[in-house]
């Protein structure tokens, strides 16, 4: 049955969308298949794609709301049927789409009596509402309903600290993910006496993007994670060339008797002071004066370190001992001493 539903290519790996439907403005569904895969590969890909779908896809949410003359979340507003708490829950569910990563402001200012929906939100040009019928509040009297909204694009979940918000400002614990659900299943089959697998992936979105777009974004996020590994060899070769050029320049400036020291200096440029395992006070003191590598540190004498603000004798002693312990380097007391 599965083989009849999806044509199995003899060699090339192929993605296919085998079902797509829109149940409502805020519920889109897509079913996809990838084949042929070797035994075990379908599970590997399925787990990775599902986690990327649920955790890596960006969405847009309302993150804070400012009410007028409201002191706490469980207040009621004259002429408004819902409590502030209920309004916040309704606003949290509003589905938005944005192409901007900046925190943006929107507002609602409307005279009742009226049923307030997402259509009544005055949005910046870069943000749009997916379902204009989503309910926000009910104005039962001839009063104004005025609120300001903060909107942001992000990924995952964000639980805001309520202490940060006061004077009518209320945080909204945003669920940025536009993915309602994601599942996968694996089916085996035999092709020319060889066992192979088909991976099925099901995706439900909130309508701010299609399941196909979500799957593409999830795949791209996984690719981006592995790209540095693919380029590691090339980067290593480039670093070798850089070090060789650096070494040749320095060699022309120093006599042959100093070549060993030059080599050491070059390598120290790529070793960070984290390797010294210094206590926090000494480590932070060095960082404040832009000492990031061992090479940077060797530009200082003990006398120079004394001039760093809040860098006392104890910190200097810790640096001296750490250099000796990890790299067998003696830090001179001053720049003019060599073997003191």
Swiss-Prot record:
Region called Alpha N-terminal domain (alpha-NTD), residue ranges: 1-233
NCBIfam families: rpoA
Organism: Anthoceros angustus
Region (Alpha C-terminal domain (alpha-CTD)): 263-340
Keyword annotations: Chloroplast, DNA-directed RNA polymerase, Nucleotidyltransferase, Plastid, Transcription, Transferase
One GO MF term attached to the UniProt entry: DNA-directed RNA polymerase activity
One annotated GO biological process: DNA-templated transcription
Protein's name in the database: DNA-directed RNA polymerase subunit alpha
Domain remark from Swiss-Prot or TrEMBL: The N-terminal domain is essential for RNAP assembly and basal transcription, whereas the C-terminal domain is involved in interaction with transcriptional regulators and with upstream promoter elements.
EC number: 2.7.7.6
Catalytic activity line of the entry: RNA(n) + a ribonucleoside 5'-triphosphate = RNA(n+1) + diphosphate
One GO CC annotation: mitochondrion
Function as written in the Swiss-Prot or TrEMBL entry: DNA-dependent RNA polymerase catalyzes the transcription of DNA into RNA using the four ribonucleoside triphosphates as substrates.
Subunit comment: In plastids the minimal PEP RNA polymerase catalytic core is composed of four subunits: alpha, beta, beta', and beta''. When a (nuclear-encoded) sigma factor is associated with the core the holoenzyme is formed, which can initiate transcription.
Lineage per the UniProt record: Eukaryota, Viridiplantae, Streptophyta, Embryophyta, Anthocerotophyta
Subcellular location: Plastid, Chloroplast
Lineage top rank: taxon: Eukaryota
CDD domains, alphabetized: RNAP_alpha_NTD
Keyword presence, Transferase: yes
Family: Belongs to the RNA polymerase alpha chain family.
């Amino acid at each position: 049955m599965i083989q009849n539903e999806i044509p199995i290519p003899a060699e090339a790996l192929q993605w296919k969308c085998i079902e797509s439907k829109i149940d409502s403005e805020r519920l889109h569904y897509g079913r996809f298949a990838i084949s042929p895969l070797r035994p075990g590969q379908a599970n590997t890909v399925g787990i990775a794609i599902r986690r990327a779908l649920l955790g890596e896809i960006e969405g847009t949410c309302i993150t804070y709301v400012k009410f007028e003359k409201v002191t706490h979340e469980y207040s009621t507003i004259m002429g408004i049927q819902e409590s502030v708490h209920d309004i916040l829950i309704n606003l949290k569910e509003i589905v938005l789409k944005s192409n901007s990563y900046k925190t943006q402001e929107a507002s609602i200012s409307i005279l009742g009596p009226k049923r307030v929906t997402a259509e009544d939100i005055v949005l910046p040009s870069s943000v749009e509402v997916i379902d204009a019928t989503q309910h926000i509040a009910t104005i039962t009297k001839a009063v104004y309903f005025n609120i300001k909204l903060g909107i942001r694009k992000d990924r995952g979940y964000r639980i805001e600290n309520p202490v940060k918000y006061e004077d009518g400002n209320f945080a909204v614990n945003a669920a940025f993910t536009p993915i309602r659900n994601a599942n996968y299943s694996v089916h085996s089959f035999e092709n020319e006496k060889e066992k192979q697998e088909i991976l099925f992936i099901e995706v439900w979105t909130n309508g701010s993007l299609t399941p196909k777009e979500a799957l593409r974004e999830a795949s791209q996020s996984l690719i981006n994670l592995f790209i540095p590994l693919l380029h590691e060899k090339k980067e290593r070769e480039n670093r070798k060339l850089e070090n060789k050029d650096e070494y040749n320049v320095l060699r022309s400036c120093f006599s042959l008797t100093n070549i060993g020291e030059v080599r050491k200096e070059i390598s120290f440029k790529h070793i960070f002071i984290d390797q010294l395992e210094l206590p926090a006070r000494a480590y932070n003191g060095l960082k404040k004066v832009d000492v990031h590598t061992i090479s940077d540190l060797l530009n200082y004498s003990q006398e120079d370190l004394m001039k760093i603000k809040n860098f006392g004798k104890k910190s200097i002693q810790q640096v001296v001992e750490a250099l000796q312990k990890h790299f067998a380097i003696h830090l001179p007391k001053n720049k003019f001493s060599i073997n003191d």
